[in-house]
Every structure is written in C-alpha cells, then in structure tokens.
Swiss-Prot record:
A GO molecular function held by the record: nucleic acid binding
Pfam family membership, one: UPF0102
Xref: InterPro entries: Restrct_endonuc-II-like (IPR011335), tRNA_endonuc-like_dom_sf (IPR011856), UPF0102_YraN-like (IPR003509)
PANTHER family per record: UPF0102 PROTEIN YRAN
Name the record gives this protein: UPF0102 protein BBta_0181
Gene3D superfamilies: 3.40.1350.10
Annotated HAMAP family: UPF0102 (MF_00048)
Amino acid sequence: MAKAEHTSTAKPSKPAAPERVAAFRTGLSAEARAAALLIAKGYRILAKRFRTPHGEIDIIARKRDLVTFVEVKARASLDDAAYAVTPRQQQRIIDAAQAWLMTHPEHAEFELRFDAILVAPRSLPRHLIAAFDAST
C-alpha cells in the first residue's frame, strides 16, 4: 500500500527583511529615548504605540492638565527628521487621537497638543512643542 503524501498549500513565512528589522529596532530605540526625554521633563506616559485602523500614535503623555500626542521621528539628521511628518500622517495621528479620546473620556476636557520628538545619531532628541495642530 502506497503511503499518501501530504502537501501543504501554506507558504512558509519568510523572515523579515534585514532592513525592516533594523528600521523597527531603530524606531523602538528612538521611542524609548523620546519617552525618557518626556519623563525627564515631567510628563507621565499614558500609552505607547497606540494603534487604530486610522493611524498610530507613538507616545501619549500627560503633564498636569495637558495631554500631548507625540510623533517620534528617527532619521540620519535632526533636519531630515523634522521634514518627515507629512500632512497626511498628521491627519492620521489626529484621527487616532480622536479614537483614543473616545476610549479615555476622562481626558476629554484636558488641553490637547500634537508634538514631535526628533531623534538622530550622536544628537540629543529635539522636542518640538505644538509641531502641528488639529486644524491642519
């Protein structure tokens, strides 16, 4: 009696491309540096990497009656990082912030702000306060 062969139609998963893994690790490191900067400035981190179908917010932090939604950008230079937050990305962050506020109504009356923290090798992170606003 012949033994039946089992063939799988599922493709084996490929490991992530080294460039993507490196970019992911760079992003995590930049977010950790940004969170440390915010904590040193007196902020309390409320959430990291908050994801919605509409977008993602890297860090949500609070200081007194202010909630700030922070986009972290890591690039080869701080100038390159400064230009990396596009209007489309800003809108996605604003949409994600609205989703977060719907699930955290206790913060709805707080002052809200959209900041960016720029990270580059051999440089201190740069905190751009009110990098953009919800009217853009």
